[in-house]
């Protein structure tokens, strides 16, 4: 029984517009080369919150609150061809998007 090869791509970014644009570009490239794409699946957004004192000396009750949201998407490319791998390697994505690629 032959096992099908699968490429799992995980995208992370602080801006959801950039990540959606990158995901659409990856899906379009993979479909153009004849691969089957599952996704993009939106994963839960991670929130990091920081509380910082406004005053350097007194007024502990006065604080600023900041947060960083990390958006994530997951895609699987099932049974990729050599053309698919070459096209994905040549793909130019925005600088704000972190890409993790696993071959399974």
UniProtKB/Swiss-Prot annotation:
The processes (GO biological process) annotated in the record are: translation
State a GO cellular component annotated for this protein: ribosome
Ribonucleoprotein is among the record's keywords: yes
Q: Which UniProt keywords apply?
A: Ribonucleoprotein, Ribosomal protein
Q: Name one GO molecular function term.
A: tRNA binding
Question: Is Zinc-finger there in the keyword field?
Answer: no
Q: Which residues form a coiled coil?
A: none
Family (UniProt): Belongs to the universal ribosomal protein uS10 family.
Could you describe the subunit structure of this protein? Answer: Part of the 30S ribosomal subunit.
User: What does this gene product do?
Assistant: Involved in the binding of tRNA to the ribosomes.
Identification of the protein by name: Small ribosomal subunit protein uS10
Which species is listed as the source? Answer: Albidiferax ferrireducens (strain ATCC BAA-621 / DSM 15236 / T118)
């Amino acid at each position: 029984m032959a096992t099908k090869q699968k490429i799992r791509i995980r995208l992370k970014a602080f801006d959801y517009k950039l990540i959606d644009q990158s995901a659409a570009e990856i899906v379009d490239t993979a479909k153009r080369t004849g691969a089957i794409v599952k996704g993009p699946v939106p994963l839960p957004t991670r929130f990091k919150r920081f509380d910082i004192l406004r005053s350097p000396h007194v007024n502990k009750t006065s604080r600023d609150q900041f947060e960083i949201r990390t958006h994530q998407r997951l895609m699987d490319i099932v049974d990729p061809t050599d053309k698919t791998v070459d096209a994905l390697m040549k793909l130019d994505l925005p600088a704000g998007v972190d890409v993790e690629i696993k071959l399974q």
